Amino acid sequence: MTSQKIVKRLGKTSIVPPHGSDELKPLLLEGEALSQALHNAKNLPKITLSSRERGDLIMLGIGGFTPLDGFMNQADWQGVVDEMTLKTGANKGLFWPIPITLSTSKEQADSLAPGDEVALVAEDGEIMGVITVEETYTIDKAHECQQVFTTTEEEHPGVKQVMEQGEVNVAGAVKVFSQGEFPTLYPEIYKTPAETRKLFEEKNWQTIAAFQTRNPMHRSHEYLAKIAIEICDGVMIHSLLGALKPGDIPAEVRQEAIKTLIDNYFKKDTVIQAGYPLDMRYAGPREALLHALFRQNYGCSHLIVGRDHAGVGDYYGPFDAQAIFDEIDKDAMLTQPLKIDWTFWCNACQAMASTKTCPHDAEHHVKVSGTKLRKALSEDQEVPENFSRPEVLQILRNYYESIAKEDRAEVKLVGASAQ
């Protein structure tokens, strides 16, 4: 669906509505309601959240997972895992690509009954919210992993998370107390869906492309974003601020590098930088669908989907995350993919290009990837000038110079990143 068709479908001055709802459904308490709920929660039984569950809870709180009202029950878990469809309640039949679940030990689950309230506590002890128990249930973890990640190998970081989670899932509606450290650690870029929607309205943007990133932006990323600017009113560079895998570059370094790129190489008022609180799942195609779905809640009409979106290692083909959008119902969600082919620097063209636009043989191409860039920098290798802008490279070099060589995580080139 083109940006023009989306505008026509939504109305002349509309931003894309939230997924499955006419309005955002944030679950974050404020004011007196928050004070009272926090006071009551101190005397409740507690479930300690994993990092992934904490990020999911915050997304529920800020409306990023609209229209969900909490962690999924067994029927919804099964429907999402097998059919990418919710099966119960007001959201029955709604598209959802990845299960959003809470787990605990069998011992604790045995002590819970429907209707019980349980405090949800971060690993540092902060009470993040409460859940009203609907049910507890066990799952086939290997089945979830095979369906969502297409593998059960525990070398896959997303599979490892699922296999290590608690034995029993706890379903129920939640009330959220906190957005964690994100608003204070990243005050310039951390934004809720309500805040990005307001920003888009102020800029009079109707069609917005989200660019998902967990890396500093190199020349291929810059090229993808500029293609999107030609098609849409604006681009939101949306950085993941939650947990990553070893060897990935911290969010504060990425924030500085991306700001420098925007300030020096993008036209004013065509792009904004924002951040969101999730951890990476590395679910490849399924995660690309989730990325598009919650970007709809943030107000984005499009998601840029390039090579190996949300991938890790060699678990997915370079364009599997594009192909999966053709496998779902066309009305599954409103946010549409901007599918862009393999991009690279061409020495013959003396410019960035793609396999669709460049007539020259592969010997002229310099294929750029975030993994290649991280590997070169972590090993103090020379980085070709066509990999990244010099101002960005300097920020990244400064970061790696601050880490002793023996403390740097090994970066391996496998799968699409090695090509």
Swiss-Prot record:
It catalyses: sulfate + ATP + H(+) = adenosine 5'-phosphosulfate + diphosphate. The keyword Nucleotide-binding applies. One of its GO terms (biological process) is sulfate assimilation. Pathway: Sulfur metabolism; hydrogen sulfide biosynthesis; sulfite from sulfate: step 1/3. Gene3D superfamilies: HUPs, Sulfate adenylyltransferase. InterPro entries: ATP-Sase_PUA-like_dom (IPR025980), PUA-like_sf (IPR015947), Rossmann-like_a/b/a_fold (IPR014729), SO4_adenylyltransferase_pro (IPR020792), Sulfurylase_cat_dom (IPR024951), Sulphate_adenylyltransferase (IPR002650). It holds the Pfam family PUA_2. One of its GO terms (molecular function) is ATP binding. It is an enzyme of class 2 (transferase). Its EC number is 2.7.7.4. Keywords: ATP-binding, Nucleotide-binding, Nucleotidyltransferase, Transferase. Belongs to the sulfate adenylyltransferase family. This is Sulfate adenylyltransferase.
